[in-house]
Amino acid sequence: MISFKNQIKKLNSSGYLRKRSVVSNENSSKVILNNKLLTSFLSNDYLGMSKNRIIINELKKSANIYGIGSGSSPLISGYSKSHHYLEKEIAEYLNVEACLVVNSGYMANLCLMNIFDQQMNVIQDRESHNSIIESSKINKIKINRYKHLDNIHLEKYLDYKNRDIIFSESVFSMTGDITNIKEHYKLKNKYDSILFIDDAHGFGIAKCPLKNCSIENSCSSFNIKMSNIDAYMGTFGKAIGTVGAFVCGGKDLIDMLVQKGRPYIYSTALPRCIIDATRKSLKILVSNKSRYNKLHKNISYFNQRALKKNITMDLTNGPIKTYMIGNPHSTLSIKDKFLKAGILVQAIRYPTVPKGHDKIRITITSDHTKKDIDKLLNTLENIHCEKSK
């Protein structure tokens, strides 16, 4: 039998060993761990939709009629009326030609790069999500990676002679940094490039100034029409509270994904009950902005309080906040200090982030109260004071 004991031991001693915790989620802000109720700042269920009774009842109703599995891939018999309607509805919400629903955000990015040949040049941020990096590597497409959020460095890789692909997250999942999509769009036009935006952490929650925005997204937050983006990816497992993802863009793009998107072609389709629950969640979010408004009130409150306490961290208008440590062992130690205070946060370490960029990751949701946020920041303030000594 093959043994990995030495490798596991080495990871543990270096502070990079990953571990799972068995938790029970009460909602997006409260979890039970080791029989203790804790305040959680771990969840990407930003609007608390996974616990919405209307959505849960829709899932139950659909499961009672259609069962809990799709039974086959989308190109066999797994593509139902519900899948078709969801794709049409997303395309209408975002004002694009077509949409393809897939099983996960990772799969969406893998599918997207399947349709390009190895002659293409993909330009990515150095802190891109693993799915963006791996989607190009697997398909043996040339990758150039520019300094984080550095559009001047990005432009050095663009060439008038080639149709390069600029592929970026809108909101970086491990830092909370927000891409200036407007600048990317300008470079796309200047060099006749192709622009892909992965909006996993922006779809449904991005701060959107447009009154006619059906469903909030990062492109609208920069006043960029979705039709100006060659491919846009969003997920259902975050703001929408279900599971799955989608790619949208021109009809030709979606048709080609159906022809060549191998993870889509060869995977069992999402269950119809999940699709029906997702449709219901989207309809609620389009018609009722109360949870969206509560989330942004919580984000503003966090930012104001953190500034007042002089805690050093980037304070964007998104829900992801990070506190830089720079050492894996110290990061794990600080995570334990939060745990002793009854708070769950995530220790992010290499290889998820570059070495020396180890940090504490915090996510704000609409379920958090001011009391929750104050408790978190008071604990963080004490840690920050100790760290600064």
Regions found by a protein language model. Give the residues of each.
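Conserved active-site segment immediately N-terminal to the catalytic lysine
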Residues: 192, 213-236, 255, 259
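PLP-dependent aminotransferase-class I/II
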Residues: 119, 124-168, 290
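Conserved core segment of the aminotransferase class I/II
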Residues: 231-233, 240-289
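Conserved PLP-binding catalytic core of the aspartate aminotransferase-like
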Residues: 293-300, 307-342, 352, 357, ...
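Conserved N-terminal alpha-helix of the aminotransferase class I/II PLP-enzyme fold
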Residues: 57-104, 299
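PLP-dependent enzyme catalytic core of the Aspartate aminotransferase-like
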Residues: 53, 57-61, 65, 88, ...
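N-terminal "arm"/small-domain region of PLP-dependent enzymes with the aminotransferase-like
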Residues: 2-6, 10-66, 162, 193
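Active-site phosphate-binding strand-loop segment of PLP-dependent enzymes
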Residues: 45, 144, 148-197
